[in-house]
């Protein structure tokens, strides 16, 4: 169902094509195809994603193959599940009970897809638009976010990526400091970009709360509730329990819980039209 007040897919679209930003896909390939049909996705259109292309849903392999085949018509930031897949491939991390990537890991093009995936950024900037997976903390300026993203991207895409993925996991340091170095600095950066939901006034991360905005732990609030040092419109995913609701006109949540049996949502950048389809896959 289109969520843009009855605006028909394709009406008033630029002749050079439109750009659609979609929420967390997480291996829900059938839902993605249904959403693209709903928006009338054409050969001149572009697809952006807020990350988490893989895991929890049934067909991560098809999602990665489809995204890669779009070439320069596709853009995406890395999400925590994407990084988990890369940590399994390059860092030797074990399969978790909740993972659903067996067919992807066994595919003949698994390494080729992993090589493509690890070239994706942590932050996309396009004029006055930003795309991240989890968010940008209020203690960073956009210049800081850009700098820290590029630092980690260089490591992930460089010869030391295996060492990075072996040391990526962990909740510490939970508070950003400018003097952080090495793996501590990279881990904190990744956690802000891909795992953040709640922070305190100083920017300290809280990792346990994954639910709604009810019953928040004392001293913590959603990252987007603090005065931001970032201008423009920011698109993010990761926090399915929000169902897209932030109460902020310029901070757009796009994870509407498709992998949990709810909906998959996309926004057309040119006019802000919102589109959603019901999940086609059974919830795990």
Where do the protein language model's features map onto the residues?
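A short acidic-Thr-Gly-centered motif at the start of a beta-strand
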Residues: 5-15, 40, 67-69, 121-125, ...
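Active-site neighborhood of phospho(di)ester-bond hydrolases with catalytic His/Asp-centered motifs
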Residues: 22-23, 47-51, 76-79, 234-237, ...
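Active-site environment of divalent metal-dependent phosphoester hydrolases
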Residues: 26-30, 55-58, 81-87, 138-139, ...
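Acidic, His/Gly-rich catalytic cores of divalent-metal-dependent hydrolytic chemistry
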Residues: 146-284
